[in-house]
């Protein structure tokens, strides 16, 4: 039975996780498809560019990665302290690099909040702060983007990934090194 990601990822126990995303329908993530001869190597650039953006936005540090022909591996570190130390302005600035910020939050940030907007804006900023340190949101922002680009390029719709990403807690330095060597 599938467990909720919140039951699988506990930054208090360990901040390090090995995450894996795998393609479906014999789709190619990167490299050359021997059957069609089509080269998908440029997709690695998409992934690296997106990972660079996510490193600037999230408080999740990328320790290692490997991009294979039909899947990828990431070793990440959830930096909870960094998320907690961000100012409200920094949270909004980071969040707005990936998502639209409601006008109400912009008004609040500029000091022009209407009655009742301040509490709602502060609740949204608190939610965004949590999400900036959430592996599921990090992976969502990576996988959705890559799937849309690949589907657009392939001229198709539907799933690009084999389902939810896989994640494994890395409990000690030995495990961390083993994942990074892979």
Where are the regions a protein language model picked out?
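Short catalytic/metal-binding and nucleic-acid-binding patches
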Residues: 1-182
